[in-house]
Swiss-Prot record:
Lineage, broadest ranks: Bacteria, Pseudomonadati, Pseudomonadota, Gammaproteobacteria, Enterobacterales
Keyword terms, alphabetized: ATP-binding, Cytoplasm, Kinase, NAD, NADP, Nucleotide-binding, Transferase
Cofactors required: a divalent metal cation
Gene that encodes the chain: nadK
Taxonomic source organism: Serratia proteamaculans (strain 568)
Similarity field: Belongs to the NAD kinase family.
Positions annotated as active site in the UniProt record: D73
Name the UniProt record assigns to this protein: NAD kinase
Amino acid sequence: MNKKFACIGIVGHPRHPSALATHEMLFHWLVARGYSVMVERQIAQDLGLKDAVTGSLAEIGQKADLAVVVGGDGNMLGAARVLARYDIKVIGVNRGNLGFLTDLDPDNALQQLADVLEGEYIDEQRFLLETIVHKENQQCRISTAINEVVLHPGKVAHMIEFEVYIDDRFAFSQRSDGLIIATPTGSTAYSLSAGGPILTPSLEAIALVPMFPHTLSARPLVINGNSTIRLKFSQIGSDLEISCDSQIALPIQEGEEVLIRRSDFHLNLIHPKDYSYFNTLSTKLGWSKKLF
């Protein structure tokens, strides 16, 4: 039997009234069942929950056993980068569009969540990527990503010239619009749209996917998940950026390099007991249906 939960955190940034209604429904349902509940501070303000215990994402990560993220995959990614630093499990209620990472159907969320709270769930650990933009003898800039790290131009699209080193060995050079470095979790996101492979979540692997390469021979590359990737540039003629999950952007200046490696943190993502990754591929992404 899996671990049961005593303190539940409710997080997410609602963009429409139906999502906010789901937050409110969850709060009252959990309180009625006797659970200790922490609500992300902004949500409590939006709902007018004056007597609720509130906190930041970090405080919820420190004190709660389980975080319920209400929203779409963007909400999950933003919350997960913070919550991955703490010993807390995370599950999502889908109030977005695709909802690849948010398993619970809002129309049936309470029944599914009741089973999860009784210990009926599947536990997964999803690793993150750490990105470091640095130059010798200067302060570096660091961020993390659940899905992918993307090298791309800043404001105006243009060709980028760069070299890729894997574990300090030259791997390839490229002229392209950029490069996607994806985790297994992110292999079904931006990387997939660029022709990258699908990596099942338990794989210890990283995918490197070129973006519009100016060659007929460039192909996606899958490497060991413990490898260190270094991006070098002969010169940076105009704005370049590294983005993490399309939410955080780190500018790259002349003379700087980019280091990407597996983070020390991981996300404790849980699913309902009947969860199937391949069924999710089918229902969310139109993966091949069963023939017989």
